[in-house]
Each structure stands twice: as structure tokens, then as C-alpha cells.
Amino acid sequence: MHILHIASSPRGERSVSLKLASRYLETLTSLHPESTVDVLDVWTIDLLPFDGPALEAKYADLQGVQMSDEQQAVWKQIHALGERFHRADVILFSVPMWNFGVPYRLKHLIDSVSQRGVLFEFDAQGMRGLLKGKNVVVFASRGVALGEDFPTEAYDHQVAYLKTWARMVGIPTIDAVLSEATLADPATAEANFTAALAEASKLAAAVQP
């Protein structure tokens, strides 16, 4: 089993979402020691600006126009990034909530790699995702708890966004574990985190290779 872990918090070992993902991976690899993990840290990877040559390459591809050498080089890098998704059996996101959404570097990664011929295609029925048969697991942290003041259906642009992306690339359902109210009083934050850790272990134990 091969896991692609997309780490999107810049806080390192202090990150709640990363701690949850680490618990999941520790449990999973202890049960399936043959598993391999590819860590894609959005804060350390060299993401190309998606403008200029990258944008022109995108439209050249869509329109069937010959790319320049510069555009071909950029497009080759995007395909290489996409291969990391294709090689994975499990795509794992550890993601904090920033302003009700995801960190901008994660959005940059997704915008770069989600291209025709990389993660999806068009056919007679419309868009067809190319990552069918894979699992997506999201470990999400939130400083506040969504609820009465901030209804989930209106304010969740974190897990809901990743669900939408997963459907676009051919993965109809995802598993998500939340640790909310990380900025609340210590007792509340710790209780939520402890429950989320247990859920992460349980989710990993249920994985079938």
C-alpha cells in the first residue's frame, strides 16, 4: 500500500492536523509494514507560479496547440507532480482551517495539478476523474468549532472543498477526522484532540490493503 501524505500546515510538530495524520500513519504502518509513505509538504516543495508559461501551456493543451519549449518543460513538471497522486492508494491530507478555507499553498498545489490529462479528462458525458479506486483521508484542525454562529454548510470551505475536489478527480467519498476548537480552553481543546486521535487510529485499523 502506498500513501501520499499532503501536509499543509507550516507549524511542524506543533500542528494538530499533522499529529492526527501521524497517528493514522503510525497505526497503519504498524499493521501493514509493507506500506510506503510519500510526504508532499506544500511549504517546502517548489511549486511553480501558475501564470505565464503554465497558464499558456494549459490552454495550448486544451486547444490542441503546439507548446513552446518553455511550456513543455512546465507541463512536464505538472505531469510529474500528478504521477505522485496516481501512484498512491491512499491520498492523505493534513490540513488546518484558515479563514474557513484551506492554506493558500494547498490551494496552489491543487490548482496546479488538477489539469486535463493529469487528474481528469473530458468525454461525451463531461468531466471524468482519473483517480478512481483511491481513498482520500482528511485530518482537519479548526481553531473554532463550526455550529450555530458559523453553520457548517455555509462556513466549511475546508473539508467540503476537499470533498468537491475528490469528486472531480473520480473519488466519490472521503473519510474525514476533525479536531475543532483548538483555540478554546485547554480542557475542551484537549478532549476534542484526544477523541480525534482515537478516531484516527480506528480509521487506520479498518484499512484493507
Swiss-Prot record:
HAMAP family: Azoreductase_type1. InterPro entries: Flavodoxin_fold, Flavoprotein-like_sf, FMN-dep_NADH:Q_OxRdtase_AzoR1, NADH:quinone_OxRdtase_FMN_depd. This is FMN-dependent NADH:quinone oxidoreductase 2. It comes from the Bacteria. The keyword Oxidoreductase applies. Pfam families: Flavodoxin_2 (PF02525). Quinone reductase that provides resistance to thiol-specific stress caused by electrophilic quinones. Also exhibits azoreductase activity. Catalyzes the reductive cleavage of the azo bond in aromatic azo compounds to the corresponding amines. Gene3D superfamilies: 3.40.50.360. Coiled coil: none annotated. Transmembrane segments: none annotated. Its EC number is 1.6.5.-, 1.7.1.17. Its cofactor is FMN. It comes from Pseudomonas syringae pv. tomato (strain ATCC BAA-871 / DC3000). The gene is azoR2. PANTHER family: FMN-DEPENDENT NADH-AZOREDUCTASE 1 (PTHR43741), FMN-DEPENDENT NADH:QUINONE OXIDOREDUCTASE (PTHR43741:SF4). The keyword Disulfide bond does not apply. It catalyses: 2 a quinone + NADH + H(+) = 2 a 1,4-benzosemiquinone + NAD(+); N,N-dimethyl-1,4-phenylenediamine + anthranilate + 2 NAD(+) = 2-(4-dimethylaminophenyl)diazenylbenzoate + 2 NADH + 2 H(+). Keywords: Flavoprotein, FMN, NAD, Oxidoreductase. GO terms for molecular function: electron transfer activity; FMN binding; oxidoreductase activity, acting on NAD(P)H as acceptor; oxidoreductase activity, acting on NAD(P)H, quinone or similar compound as acceptor. Belongs to the azoreductase type 1 family. FMN binds at residues 9, 15-17, 97-100. Binds 1 FMN per subunit.
